C-alpha cells in the first residue's frame, strides 16, 4: 500500500473512532448546549461564545468516543455491534488513539481558555466525569445517569460563561436533559442487551428488562412535565407549546410504537428520532425570544 493510501485509510479509521460518520451523538450534545445558550442570553448568544461552545461540543463528543472505546477495548471485541470498531478490530492502535485524544483535548482547552474561570473549572469536572463514565457500566446498572450529567453539563456552563447565576430554570433544564439522556441511551442500550448480559455489562436496559417500555414511558412523561414547567416559568410563546411540547409528545408516542416491536432496528430508529426531540425544543425556546 502506498504512503498516500495508507494515510487516507488511517484518517478514515480515525474519523470512525471519533464517530464523525455518526453525527447523532454530536447533535444530542449540541441541542442542550444551544438550549442553555439561548436561555442564558435570553435570545441569540454572543457569537464568540456560540462558536466556542459548538466547536467545544464537537471536540468533546469525539474525545468522549475515544475515551469510551479505549476503556472498553477488552469488551467491544465480544459485542456484535462494536467488534468492528477501529480499536478492537486493530485498525487503530491504542497509542494512536491517545494521540488523537490529546489533540482534541488540547483544542478544547484552547477554546475554553477564552471563557471565565468558573466555566473553565466546570469543563475540567466534565473531563473527569468523561473518564469515569465508561467504567460505571461494569459496576452499576445506571451508567446512563452519568451520561445524562455529562450531556447536561454544557447547560450550566452556558450560564456561567456570561457570568449569569445558575438559576432555577437552568437546573430544570439540566434535570430534564438528564432524564432525556437516560431515555435515549436506554433505547440505545436495548440494542446490545443480549450481548451486554453475556459479557457482564450493566445498563438501565438490562435492569429494566421486560419493563423497559413502561419505565421509559414514565421518564418521558417526566420530561414533558418539566418542559411544560420551563415554558410556563419563562412565559414562552405559543410556538413553544405547539412545536416543543406538543411535538415532543408526538415523538415520544412514536418511540413507544417503535420499541414495542422488540427489534434491534426499531430500537435504533427510536434512538435516532431523539435528534428531532432536541431540535423541536430548541425551535420553541429560540422562537420565544424574537
UniProtKB/Swiss-Prot annotation:
Membrane topology field: Multi-pass membrane protein
GO cellular component, one term: plasma membrane
Pathway named in the protein's UniProt entry: Cofactor biosynthesis; ubiquinone biosynthesis
EC number assigned by the record: 2.5.1.39
Biological processes annotated in GO: ubiquinone biosynthetic process
InterPro entries: HB_polyprenyltransferase-like, Prenyltransferase, UbiA_prenyltransferase, UbiA_prenylTrfase_CS, UbiA_sf
Catalyzed reactions per annotation: all-trans-octaprenyl diphosphate + 4-hydroxybenzoate = 4-hydroxy-3-(all-trans-octaprenyl)benzoate + diphosphate
CDD domains cross-referenced by the UniProt entry: PT_UbiA_COQ2
UniProt-annotated location(s): Cell inner membrane
Name of one Pfam family that matches: UbiA
Domain of life: Bacteria
Transmembrane segments: 24-44, 48-68, 98-118, 142-162, 171-191, 214-234, 239-259, 270-290
Chief localisation class: membrane
Molecular function via GO: 4-hydroxybenzoate polyprenyltransferase activity
Keywords: Cell inner membrane, Cell membrane, Magnesium, Membrane, Transferase, Transmembrane, Transmembrane helix, Ubiquinone biosynthesis
Cofactor dependency: Mg(2+)
Function: Catalyzes the prenylation of para-hydroxybenzoate (PHB) with an all-trans polyprenyl group. Mediates the second step in the final reaction sequence of ubiquinone-8 (UQ-8) biosynthesis, which is the condensation of the polyisoprenoid side chain with PHB, generating the first membrane-bound Q intermediate 3-octaprenyl-4-hydroxybenzoate.
PANTHER family: 4-HYDROXYBENZOATE POLYPRENYLTRANSFERASE, MITOCHONDRIAL (PTHR11048:SF28), PRENYLTRANSFERASES (PTHR11048)
Family: Belongs to the UbiA prenyltransferase family.
Protein's name according to its UniProt entry: 4-hydroxybenzoate octaprenyltransferase
Source organism per UniProt: Blochmanniella pennsylvanica (strain BPEN)
Biological classification of the source: Bacteria, Pseudomonadati, Pseudomonadota, Gammaproteobacteria, Enterobacterales
Gene name, Swiss-Prot/TrEMBL: ubiA
